[in-house]
């Protein structure tokens, strides 16, 4: 059975909701899933899972959330060769740097040797029905990428 680790940063609750939607999607795919908040998680924990996911918001003018900075820096030092990763998160399309932290984390994962299992998912504010469908498809694609490599 495949395993997945979802680490999230959430200020308004939108990204925690995204993490919960992904958790349910993976459970429905018979994936053993663990979810934790970013400030309570060490980046090295990703080594223990097959599929590694970050869910984050973007703060201010395209900045990482304060509580995610240490994790972000530590992540880039990890060796996650052979692992599958995916990034998702919320933002506000009002801003020029819409959900930029999602892309920043995807770039950080690429430095670890992990394989991007699905394109990033960016959600405008809170997830709505079409976003839930996109997140379910995201989870399926991550699992399909994992299965194709194992």
What residue ranges belong to the model's regions?
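Local sequence-structure signature of Cys/Sec-based thiol-disulfide redox active-site neighborhoods
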Residues: 4, 8
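FMN-binding flavodoxin-like domain, especially the glycine-rich phosphate-binding loop
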Residues: 3, 14-17, 25, 29, ...
């Amino acid at each position: 059975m495949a395993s997945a680790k979802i680490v999230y940063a959430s200020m308004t609750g939108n990204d925690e909701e995204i993490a919960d939607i992904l958790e349910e999607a993976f459970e429905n795919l018979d994936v053993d899933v663990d979810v934790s908040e970013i400030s309570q998680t060490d980046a090295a924990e990703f080594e223990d899972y097959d599929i590694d996911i970050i869910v984050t918001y973007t703060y201010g003018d395209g900045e990482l959330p304060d509580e995610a900075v240490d994790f972000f820096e530590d992540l880039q030092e990890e060796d996650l060769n052979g692992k599958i990763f995916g990034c998702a998160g919320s933002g506000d399309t009002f801003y020029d740097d819409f959900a930029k932290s999602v892309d920043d984390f995807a770039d950080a994962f690429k430095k670890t040797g992990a394989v991007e299992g699905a394109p990033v998912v960016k959600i405008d504010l809170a997830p709505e029905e079409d976003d839930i469908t996109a997140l379910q498809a995201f989870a399926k694609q991550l699992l399909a990428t994992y299965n194709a490599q194992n």
